[in-house]
From Swiss-Prot:
Entry protein name: NADH-ubiquinone oxidoreductase subunit NUO2
Source taxon at top rank: Eukaryota
InterPro entries listed in its UniProt record: NADH_Ub_cplx-1_21kDa
Disruption phenotype: Reduces mitochondrial NADH dehydrogenase activity. Leads to growth defects on glycerol and oleic acid, and shows reduced oxygen consumption rates. Decreases the mitochondrial membrane potential. Shortens the chronological life span (CLS). Leads to sensitivity to both cell wall-damaging agents calcofluor white and Congo red, as well as to thermosensitivity. Also increases the sensitivity to oxidative stress agents H(2)O(2) and menadione, as well as to osmotic stress agent KCl. Impairs the yeast to hypha transition.
One annotated GO biological process: mitochondrial respiratory chain complex I assembly
Organism annotation: Candida albicans (strain SC5314 / ATCC MYA-2876) (Yeast)
Protein keywords: NAD, Oxidoreductase, Translocase, Ubiquinone, Virulence
């Protein structure tokens, strides 16, 4: 402790009383050192094992609705096995999208006529995609399926930039014999995209 040695009478340990304390101070090497035996009245109040009744009356806290089993089955809470659900598109669904459009670009009629058009694709009958491609207007095929002039749609290039490898005279750190490359700090546009 800072502030110098603590006198024995300030420590929470047992010590001799009266003349025995004076004899102890004469005989020991360090009189200010305590015996190390804690005072029973001041040590670990409440002692361990004292509150057995409180421990027996303990009730596990339950949070509602998370702890409620009804309406909260395990398979809904099981995030370890919550894999993405696989959805497929068959020829009937694709034919329906081509004929009736999508939510962003609908071509379906309003009202009862629209329900009849939709029933063709939802009643479980298989619709051939080849016959649908023949029957849909050319603007759908050349605009949504293919490009505007009938060319196939190509995915955009992900290599929009390339890194330039600096030669040894530019970076001046390693010779060409050392197998270490240094790249530019900025991306340089490739000639094809420029």
């Amino acid at each position: 402790m800072s502030g110098g040695p603590v006198p024995v009478w300030k420590k929470y340990t047992t010590r001799p009383q009266g003349i025995w304390e004076k004899i102890r101070q004469l005989l020991v090497l360090v009189p200010n050192r305590s015996s190390g035996n804690p005072l029973v009245s001041l040590f670990r109040q409440v002692p361990p094992g004292e509150r057995i009744k409180e421990a027996q009356n303990y009730k596990d806290p339950v949070t509602i609705p998370a702890g409620d089993i009804k309406g909260n089955p395990y398979f809904k809470r099981d995030y370890r096995r919550n894999y993405p659900q696989v959805h497929t598109f068959n020829q009937t669904k694709i034919s329906g999208l081509l004929n009736l459009g999508s939510e962003s670009n609908p071509r379906i009629s309003i009202g009862e006529k629209g329900n009849k058009e939709l029933a063709v694709f939802t009643n479980g009958q298989d619709v051939s995609l080849a016959s649908t491609l023949k029957s849909v207007p050319a603007s759908v095929v050349k605009g949504e399926v293919l490009g505007k002039s009938g060319e196939p749609i190509v995915a955009p290039s992900l290599n929009k930039f390339k890194w330039e490898i600096l030669p040894e005279p530019v970076h001046g750190m390693y010779s060409e014999a050392y197998p270490c490359r240094i790249f530019t700090e900025k991306k340089v546009r490739s000639q094809s995209s420029a």
